[in-house]
């Protein structure tokens, strides 16, 4: 056990975590030259295309150190996006240390800070690493000072390396062996194994990634899942080197995968504890705090025949992604579907894309909303995540919206732009600290404004230099209203949104205009209205297509023309009373993008 080192790699987006992982694998001979490829751990197609890490991946390597001993390194490559920070905290729970990778050109960013504090709260040893020192704009001295100044850990002797060229990577390995403590635990105690992650394999069933805290786990052991009490036999177990490699046992302190032939998707939830069926441990390990979804949206299959396969796909995906929440929902406009909860807009995009790709589904998404807290007139408090669940206005005593605390790091040159953006998003500044050339801002901004497009706007106003980290703070009373879109006098439930009263007329006009462009012309006029309750605040009309009924009258008497025109009018009127308007697919998507173009 004294030769095992468990650590995670944490960093801001694009600071070179996955490339550093590649080098570590290469130096320790985890894969042959032929199998090596760039970002070998980002195995999903989506990850490769977008160049981001979405799932944390674990690897076990053997490293022969300078002191002549061979060490077993178990490391986990983690995502950098704020939407996937729960993946990071889960990975850290399985480790004794973390490599804090900082880009020597860019310096400390908000996500570096957030992840580092998570690691320090869990009492992990944090080893700073300055990456990308081969770049001409690298300033390792300044960045080391910045780490000490902003993060508050000693960084003067931080390892300098370039993961791309492989320079200094052996120093990183030596630092890991020297500074990160060996795992604690009792090999003779009853087995306690923490499930860090699980995924569904079509042939093996549920595969779980576990960290053995106490005891050891062997092939053919009978094990028990502590939360459900079910028992299973261990069919296979092993380590990833990143290839799956079978072993006969996992010992105390190791990280590996286990297959027990569990077919039920909820058989081994993430954060649960495995123990032996006979003489097992009494108590479970402390799991992870459940993450609450911040954004909710309705997902509906385009053809209702896909509903069953959509449900199966969601079940399989939620096993792999512990923070996805879903419940059935039906809508008069879109039929049966699910109300899903996500951690942010990127998370929502990724999930939708994974469902469409990996499970061949065609989906429609409704406008995303956050969770609102409502005090009803009888004093009861309810939480709603969908505009259609909003009670009638005379039953609401107070409507409270969620406020997010945002930590923004920005270079001084862009400070003005960022402050203007925060004010536009109804933000309130609570703190501002200067660190050299960087400014750390703390704002309280309504969650609805943050999740929609705040991140994109922040990046564009600061030319990509500002970085953001946010978390839920509290609920505050606010003047919010439900904005309905009516088409020919009928409310379309899937188009309703909840918005601030001051923005409502503007949002209403924008939506109505957008709808007018997207709804195809019919044989009769279509009225598109935006309404708050019974009060119409915006309207536009899709004009009818009409036939020129006077074409065959040359000259002729005016009464003859009137007769033909009136006959046409009557027909249109009759048509309007029976005609139905189908809202096209694009109209639902347009709601998501309204307000981004201006």
Swiss-Prot record:
Sample GO molecular function, one term: translation elongation factor activity
Location within or outside the cell: Cell inner membrane
Enzyme superclass (EC): hydrolase
Binding, GTP: 14-19, 131-134
GO terms for biological process, alphabetical: positive regulation of translation
Catalysis: reaction(s): GTP + H2O = GDP + phosphate + H(+)
Residues annotated as domain tr-type G: 2-184
Swiss-Prot/TrEMBL keywords: Cell inner membrane, Cell membrane, GTP-binding, Hydrolase, Membrane, Nucleotide-binding, Protein biosynthesis
Role of this protein: Required for accurate and efficient protein synthesis under certain stress conditions. May act as a fidelity factor of the translation reaction, by catalyzing a one-codon backward translocation of tRNAs on improperly translocated ribosomes. Back-translocation proceeds from a post-translocation (POST) complex to a pre-translocation (PRE) complex, thus giving elongation factor G a second chance to translocate the tRNAs correctly. Binds to ribosomes in a GTP-dependent manner.
Family: Belongs to the TRAFAC class translation factor GTPase superfamily. Classic translation factor GTPase family. LepA subfamily.
Full protein name: Elongation factor 4
Native source species: Tolumonas auensis (strain DSM 9187 / NBRC 110442 / TA 4)
Lineage per the UniProt record: Bacteria, Pseudomonadati, Pseudomonadota, Gammaproteobacteria, Aeromonadales
Gene: lepA
